[in-house]
Amino acid sequence: MSNKAEKYSQLRTMIPEMRRVKHIYFVGIGGAGMGGIAEVLVNEGYQLSGSDIAENTVTDRLSQLGAVIHIGHNADNVKDVDVVVVSTAISADNPELMAAKELRIPVVQRAEMLAELMRYRHGVAVAGTHGKTTTTSLIASVYGQADRDPTFVIGGLLNSAGTNARLGHSRYLIAEADESDASFLHLQPMVSVVTNIEADHMDTYGGDIEKLKNTFVDFIHNLPFYGVAVVCIDDPIVRELLPRFSRKVVTYGFGDDADVQAVGFTQTGYSSQFTVRRSGVADLNLSVNLPGEHNVLNALAAIAVASEDDIEDEAIIKALAEFQGIGRRFQQVGDFETAKGEVKLVDDYGHHPSEVAATIKAARQGWPERRLVMIYQPHRYSRTRDLYEDFVEVLSQVDCLLLLDVYAAGEAAIPGADSRALCRSIRVRGQLEPVFVASTEQLQTVLPEILQNGDLLLTQGAGNIGVLSRNLAQSNLGFNVKEAEEKNG
């Protein structure tokens, strides 16, 4: 056991029924969601091991904390463990999963393990199609500033903490709630946040938007009768569902009927300024180091949660003003001097049309004088197919577009739902001439020809484009193609 794990081992009493469990194994431990839960457990004192197909920053960190990491999946890895944790991304024929079932070792979903961590804590669960990671990070930052010392599990790197998960000493657990596979229904928090609801991951819901809506209603009703739902009333589906919520509801948004309302929004570069109005208390004049109206909504959610928990306004103001951002969420990579002049590079994870539209809007508001050049990598053929016309519409809004091939995420190709098809459809609209980039070698040739002095270059998507962005930065917007491909692997 590591010294750090030893330090926190007394907190295992927060899950008393798990005392029989000593060794926990994670299949696919390098994922952000899996790795975050694993980090909390290893710091609680559990013997922890796991496997993934390659090393990454998550596995490196867990190894430093005392976890045993296996590269590659092998049935022998699970023979001496007490429980195996998997995500829905793990296939049924995974050798470790098959061995665990043969040995009658309990196999639990990632969300079930998160639910156990939350069972004996005051849980704050953040759900929604967009904004979960940023909202969860903001809530965790406010609670940290207020000396509430929360445990948190976030789907992205919280820059101020240098990690996406942390074990706190208090009763609070702040975590993302994943609706992509409906696994958030395992959670039973004290506070549930819903940022918005849109059609995404529709294979989980049989392509039925009503089933998706009903699942969010069930999520709200997992709250105890004394729990609180904090929801964005600006979202049309959330507004539609409000009459069905039979729990206390606090709404937030820009609209006049919001319980927690933002007015007077302005943006200067990466910073947003606004005033918050709440019933019966003084207005708050705030600044948050995040661009765009969508991030003001995320901040409002954090303010609403904190206000319900009687956190002082001073802590809210300071936490938002000093917020250092999250990895790959409109992340300022740097300003670079190229042969053509100065170029600003920003990297963003958004991969749904609404997310891409919000990112473009924030870029236009913060840097209206700059030409917007986007390198976009579509994520999943099924999403590209299901939201094809929306993607064509939103991607046509940039000044210059380079399209990488679809990041399949394990899916088989779907005819007519690829980047070449998107290029053709965007070109037909006549607003811009998109460029399909078939390889990183081609990008190395094309990009210098396209960039101009003063451009804002935005790398956008949820696949391996973040690695590409880092390689661009490391070599002043030129990169080692072989190294990039090896890292992207």
Curated annotation (Swiss-Prot):
Top-level lineage group: Bacteria
User: What's the protein name?
Assistant: UDP-N-acetylmuramate--L-alanine ligase
Instruction: Spell out the reaction equation it catalyses.
Output: UDP-N-acetyl-alpha-D-muramate + L-alanine + ATP = UDP-N-acetyl-alpha-D-muramoyl-L-alanine + ADP + phosphate + H(+)
Q: Which residues form a coiled coil?
A: none
Which Gene Ontology BP annotations are present? cell division; cell wall organization; peptidoglycan biosynthetic process; regulation of cell shape
Where does it live in the cell? Cytoplasm
Species this protein is from:
Shewanella piezotolerans (strain WP3 / JCM 13877)
Pathway(s) annotated for this protein in UniProt: Cell wall biogenesis; peptidoglycan biosynthesis
Could you cite one Gene Ontology molecular function of this protein?
UDP-N-acetylmuramate-L-alanine ligase activity
Ordered alphabetically, the record's keywords are: ATP-binding, Cell cycle, Cell division, Cell shape, Cell wall biogenesis/degradation, Cytoplasm, Ligase, Nucleotide-binding, Peptidoglycan synthesis
Q: What is the uppermost EC class here?
A: ligase
